[in-house]
Amino acid sequence: MMIDGLPTLDDIPYRGKHVLLRVDINAPIVNSTILDTSRFESHIPTIEALEDSKLVLLAHQSRPGKKDFTSLESHASTLSKLLGKRVEYIDEIFSKGVLRRIKEMENGEVILLENVRFYSEEQLNRSAEEHAECHMVRKLSTAFDLFVNDAFSASHRSHASLVGFVPVLPSVVGRLVENEVTALSKPLKGEGRKIFVLGGAKIKDSVKVLKNVLENNIAEKVVLTGVVANYFLMLKGYDIGEVNRKVVEDNKEDVSDEEMINILKKYSDKIILPIDLGIEKDGVRVDIPLEKFDGKYRIMDIGLETVNQLSEIIPKYDYVVLNGPAGVFEDERFSLGTYEILRAATRAGYSVVGGGHIASAARLFGLSDKFSHISTAGGACIRFLSGEKLVALEVIKEYWAKKWGKS
């Protein structure tokens, strides 16, 4: 069934077919051990849905030059364990041997090919039509009947393995993409009162979401925490001190102060900022009202009064979206803000947690299963909530409308 113009597995016959599935199982790796398998788990519904096909997976790990830029051998064994069936790993992407092995596949077999970023043209930022001409797509596409994109968390990138097959193979999205798009659309399009709680250190990301939900009248309130809140407190004229100013400057990128001051003025009744702060003084946590803060200490969390205020407000909303932690939650002295905001959100109507650090926090505090939806994506989720189009999904819509949906 189509969602918002996106064709899914329900729109195409795949039993007995050769299916090329793009997944995102990019994981934190230390000393060749995969530390977090949550992304692997998120693809299992799609892989299981395709169990009557001849299934080949494409994925990436890290990027060139990074320590964890590795082969996908351990990813294949991790997937095998989770699926309870063999996932064969091949250390190449489109050699003659690979193509021969794919042709010989039986229904129900699963193969994982090598890290697509080992291939030099993968990460070029090109259009689908240009990528369709590259070696990998030209060679591999001959062995498949259809392409499925299930890599929601990478779908904001116009890379070869994400967009290149769409012009040449009938293409749909997998269950994970379907779930993400459905769940993230609800707080943007649903009826009811909405509150967005934006924190973390990536000021530019939060500002993008803030602008979308305020300018398009989506959110009734936007709560700011973390480094983002400190930036807005600075704009309001509070002296947050040299050490905190530096953290803001280091994370601000190209956000315009002037534009943000105007937004603060225009939406002053909708933006909620901290009324007190959690700081570290002589090795212990101290909560200090905004008015009394002299900027001498590093801000580590929102303060206790702010926490109490938010714990009361958040559960009253029909929809709550959380993105980014409220403080340095990895240090238990300063985990209070993030923990209590997460807890309050579980009591709201429909609760969505963005990917990245806030999702890690939800897992750390054992709250993951209490939310309506936890996104697997960081950047792609932010872009979606900012109202931006995700290029790899738009290409699938476009080609379905003009080519594959008609055949």
Curated annotation (Swiss-Prot):
GO MF: ADP binding; ATP binding; phosphoglycerate kinase activity
Query: What are the binding positions for ATP in this chain?
Result: E330, G355, G356, H357, I358
Q: List cellular component terms (GO).
A: cytosol
Primary localisation category? cytoplasm
The UniProt keywords, alphabetically, are:
ATP-binding, Cytoplasm, Glycolysis, Kinase, Nucleotide-binding, Transferase
Q: Does the keyword Disulfide bond apply?
A: no
Quote the pathway field. Carbohydrate degradation; glycolysis; pyruvate from D-glyceraldehyde 3-phosphate: step 2/5
| PANTHER family according to UniProt | PHOSPHOGLYCERATE KINASE, PHOSPHOGLYCERATE KINASE 1, CHLOROPLASTIC-RELATED
Q: Could you tell me which HAMAP family the record lists for this protein? A: Phosphoglyc_kinase
Protein name (Swiss-Prot/TrEMBL): Phosphoglycerate kinase
